Curated annotation (Swiss-Prot):
The gene is secA. One of its GO terms (biological process) is protein transport by the Sec complex. The keyword Protein transport applies. This is Protein translocase subunit SecA. It is found in: Cell inner membrane; Cytoplasm. It is an enzyme of class 7 (translocase). InterPro entries: Helicase_ATP-bd (IPR014001), Helicase_C-like (IPR001650), P-loop_NTPase (IPR027417), SEC_C_motif (IPR004027), SecA (IPR000185), SecA_CS (IPR020937), SecA_DEAD (IPR011115), SecA_motor_DEAD (IPR014018). Part of the Sec protein translocase complex. Interacts with the SecYEG preprotein conducting channel. Has a central role in coupling the hydrolysis of ATP to the transfer of proteins into and across the cell membrane, serving as an ATP-driven molecular motor driving the stepwise translocation of polypeptide chains across the membrane.
Length: 899
């Protein structure tokens, strides 16, 4: 209430920010005459002057107005587009580290030019992040002529580039890159064995396009570099055949809930659709054990070490059959099971569900079941972007998530007014009891609109629903296009014609993000269809000029019909996604209309608002087949969405608390790696570490004589070198420590003299880094297991986060000690000769793959041609071909794995 009163009297924070930018905008407009008089060659000279001023101690704020004026004029000359005042305001907000909300078609891409140019003048680089390679390449090519005129360099990083090319692109003043590539490059850089192979430089300033998609929708999705491991894929096939033998517990037919008393549960498992969770009952576990034994899958108890994983396999199999449906969560394509993004409807190429869920779905669908993978490095987008000195972002829909942006990222949202008043009519939702009545009503509405000639865009939440509507449209003779994950290759063509007369388009949550739907169709696309692509730029421009009259005629005709009519076939969990769909209509002051059709059988209604709405509709006297439109019902729908959004926000905040623990530890490990990469005297580092460890072993020792415990530890490190130690009878700890240090120094000096200082330093660096990487990978697996373990402690009234932090710190302390000791052991015990290959090849190739994992279960494989991968979430297991844990350098199967 107080917030509403304050906004009424003094305006919202967003409005106050806009008001603050007006004096600067007026000054920029006054300077425009100065920029108009400049010759083209003067722009780069002015850029150099501004750079010199910054080097002399001037601030960005003092040169801001001239920089914005220069970049505005450069855009006018090279793009024939003069940024509107609202675009200049958007640029000012971006420079100030804000998130700008600009409606579709208002020119977000051009708005970023001024802020990017100004911040590039420091020489520390600007990164502009987009959601895919197409947009990164398109935007960099589109804006390059502007930046070229200004004398600043522009680069673009694409997924198929090697590290040398990436390094060159990141070195440019302004670099366009996707969020995935940026994250993977950060992780890869921190797995390098040579400083010169790092591609990134300092994280200075970042502008994130579609920031809500990256920092909200993708927030639960850590990036992961993974490597191969051995797994039991046959188990998923075995348990898949058992699904039909188990029965779900009965629910109360009135409430749809399970009995509260455990003894009243009559089945083998319960299903939680909201949390996507399967829980076995005691009876279910007994039945599962009997099934596994009777089918010959296991022998003996299910609760032994070798058999207990079958509970996990069976849980994932049930999830695959009951909670993850074909043509909704995934499709089966040429490359097997492919995940569909719930927010965009696009196929997430290369991504895989984690925890064995993807294997369970593959077994269910009868396709090849791929092996599992282990985590080698990981980071979330939340913590990746928080490393920048300054970040800002732009999107068409951010205001609904303003609270989360502020609380987690300390970013404020500025809603930039449209250049022209919005003419779209947003109607109240129309609500039906059943999905069948709703789809019939949508078909009737589309048929009526189609006959009139007005273009229609119908948004669906799944491929399955889009195909149902498509079949109904066909039966009514409605010509239409379907845009979903199955035919995404035709997206550009379909979107280009979606605003033409008589056009009807069914789209699955993907109404052309990054692409405008223009009334009357797309003139450039129309010309390309006529004259082809093998023509010169001059011929193309002439053809566009000749086609313009016909295009304007079509545009005005569609405009007179009411513009684009957007129909939502269902409310999404997030209001942002609904607003994105609405935003396809009413571009740049064009007329438009939008309406959502909802039924009580929709997922959102059924899970979060069904009972309340059903009661309200009954009170309003609604019959089963009748529609109802009422502001109370619309408000109830929005409240349901808010509840889901709040729940998802809490989940993301909770995940961030866990990830912050890993972040601090990762930062420490990466700092150690960087220090070692730069170190030219690693021998001294190892000797210091040895002395510290020996001192640690001596701490708290009261006896004056050497204990067996101390000797055993020393023996594990020095091994054969102890022959030169001589008698230790009656020797003190301090004297023994001094002798051991002499032996260690002599050992390392001898090896250094044998192969040379530089080569030996390189060898030590490689061994140290290899050990850090191997141990840290084990540590990540341990943290994963710890996280699952502490969750159960909430039942004992313990805070899982606190438990995770405390135990995480404890095992991290052990990790640091273990890294040092195992490295010392390895370099001391290894025998070198001048022909040894151990030090001649210190850059062994490692089979690693970047993947992208959602904590609720998604992974991504960046290498599209590589075999599918998965992240393991269990106790760490050493593969037969991995290096042995003892540090000998041998494979595990040839060392301690023999026994």
């Amino acid at each position: 209430m107080l917030k509403a009163v304050l906004e009424t009297t003094i305006g919202s924070k967003s409005k106050r920010d806009l008001k603050d930018y007006l004096p600067t905008l007026r000054n920029i407009n006054k300077l425009e005459r100065w920029a108009l008089l400049l010759a083209d060659e003067d722009f780069s000279k002015e850029t150099e002057k501004l750079k010199d001023e910054l080097k002399s101690g001037n601030s960005l704020e003092n040169i801001l107005e001239r920089a914005f004026t220069l970049s505005r004029e450069a855009a006018r000359r090279r793009l024939k587009e003069r940024p509107y005042d609202v675009q200049i305001i958007a640029g000012l907000a971006l420079h100030k580290g804000k998130i700008i909300e600009m409606k579709t078609g208002e020119g977000k891409t051009l708005s970023s030019v001024q802020a990017a140019y100004l911040n590039s003048l420091t020489g520390d680089g600007v990164i502009i992040v987009t959601v895919n390679d197409y947009l990164a390449e398109r935007d960099s090519n589109w804006m390059k002529p502007v930046f070229d005129l200004l004398g600043v360099s522009v680069g673009v990083v694409l997924s198929n580039m090697d590290y040398e090319l990436r390094k060159a692109q990141y070195a440019k003043d302004i670099t366009y890159v996707t969020n995935n590539e940026l994250g993977f490059d950060y992780l890869r850089d921190n797995m390098r064995y040579d400083l010169n192979e790092k591609s990134l430089r300092k994280f200075n300033y970042c502008i994130i396009d579609e920031i809500d998609s990256i920092l909200i929708d993708e927030a639960r999705t850590p990036l992961i570099i993974s490597g191969p491991t051995e797994g039991n894929t046959n188990a998923y096939l075995e348990v898949n055949s058992l699904v039909s033998f188990l029965k779900e517990c009965s629910k109360d037919p009135k409430t749809g809930d399970y009995p509260l008393e455990i003894d009243d549960l009559d089945g083998d498992y319960t299903v939680d659709e909201k949390a996507k969770r399967i829980s076995f009952t005691a009876k279910g576990l007994n039945n599962l054990e009997q099934l596994l034994v009777s089918k010959g899958i296991i022998s003996g108890s299910m609760y032994t070490d070798s058999n207990f994983n079958y509970v996990h396999y069976m849980t994932q199999a049930l999830k695959a059959h009951l909670l993850f449906l074909k043509n909704r969560e995934y499709i089966v394509g040429d490359s097997g099971v492919e995940i569909v993004d719930e927010f965009t409807g696009r196929v997430l190429t290369g991504r895989r569900y984690s925890d064995g869920l993807h294997q369970a779905i593959e077994a269910k669908e009868g396709v090849r079941v791929a092996n599992e993978n282990k985590t080698m490095a990981t980071i979330t987008f939340q913590n990746l972007f928080r490393m920048f000195d300054k970040i800002s972002g732009m999107t068409g829909t951010a205001d609904t998530e303003a609270k989360e942006f502020h609380k987690i990222y300390n970013l404020d949202v500025v809603v930039v007014p449209t250049n022209r008043l919005l003419a779209r009519i947003d109607e109240d939702d129309t609500i039906y009891y059943t999905e069948e009545f709703k789809f019939n009503a949508i078909t009737d509405e589309v048929y009526k609109t189609y006959k009139k000639g007005q273009p229609v865009l119908v948004g669906t939440v799944s491929i399955e629903k889009s195909e149902i509507l498509s079949a109904m449209f066909k039966s009514r003779g409605i010509k239409h296009e379907v845009l979903n994950a199955k035919n995404h290759s035709r997206e550009a063509f379909i979107i280009a014609e979606a605003g033409a007369k008589h056009a009807v388009t069914i789209a699955t949550n993907m109404a052309g993000r990054g692409t405008d739907i223009k009334l009357g169709g797309n003139i450039e696309h129309r010309v390309r269809k006529k004259i082809g692509t093998n023509v010169s730029l001059e011929e193309f421009q002439e053809a566009v000029k000749n086609e313009r009259e016909n295009y304007l005629k079509d545009y005005n005709e569609v405009k007179s019909l009411g513009g684009l009519y957007v129909i939502g076939s269902e409310r999404h969990e997030s209001r942002r996604i609904d607003n994105q769909l609405r935003g396809r209509s009413g571009r740049q002051g064009d007329p438009g209309r939008s309406r959502f059709y909802v039924s009580l059988e929709d997922d959102l209604m059924r899970l979060f608002a069904g009972d309340n709405l059903r009661s309200l509709m009954g009170k309003l006297g609604m019959a089963t087949g009748e529609p109802i439109t009422h502001s109370l019902l619309t408000k109830s729908l929005i409240n349901a969405q808010k509840r889901v959004e709040d729940r998802n926000f809490e989940i993301r905040k909770h995940l961030l608390e866990y990830d912050d623990v890993i972040t601090k530890q990762r930062d420490f490990i990466y700092a150690q790696r960087n220090s070692i990469l730069k170190d030219t005297a690693i021998k001294d580092r190892i000797l210091v570490a040895l002395e510290e460890y020996l001192s640690f072993l001596l701490e708290g020792t009261k006896s004056s004589t050497v204990s067996n415990v101390f000797l055993n530890e020393v023996n594990s490190i020095f091994a054969y070198m102890l022959e030169s130690l001589g008698s230790i009878e009656n020797i003190s700890y301090l004297d023994l420590k001094a002798k051991l240090m002499q032996i260690a120094k002599a050992n390392l000096d001898e090896k250094e003299n044998l192969i040379g200082r530089d080569l030996f330093n390189g060898f030590l660096r490689y061994e140290y880094l290899k050990n850090i990487d191997f141990k840290f990978q084990e540590h990540l697996a341990n943290l994963d297991s710890l996280r699952e373990a502490v969750y159960l402690r909430s039942y004992a009234n313990k805070n899982p986060i606190t438990e995770y932090k405390e135990e995480g710190f404890s095992i991290f302390s052990e990790l640091i000690k273990d890294i040092k000791v195992s490295t010392i052991r390895r370099v001391l015990q290894l025998k070198l000769d001048s022909n040894s290959s151990d030090f001649k090849s210190t850059k062994k190739s490692r089979n690693v793959k970047p993947i992208h994992k959602e904590l609720s279960g998604i992974v991504i494989n960046e290498n599209k041609s590589a075999s599918n991968v998965q992240v393991v979430r269990s106790s760490p297991k050493i593969g037969r071909n991995e290096p042995c844990y003892c540090g000998s350098g041998k494979k595990y199967k040839n060392c301690h794995g023999k026994s």
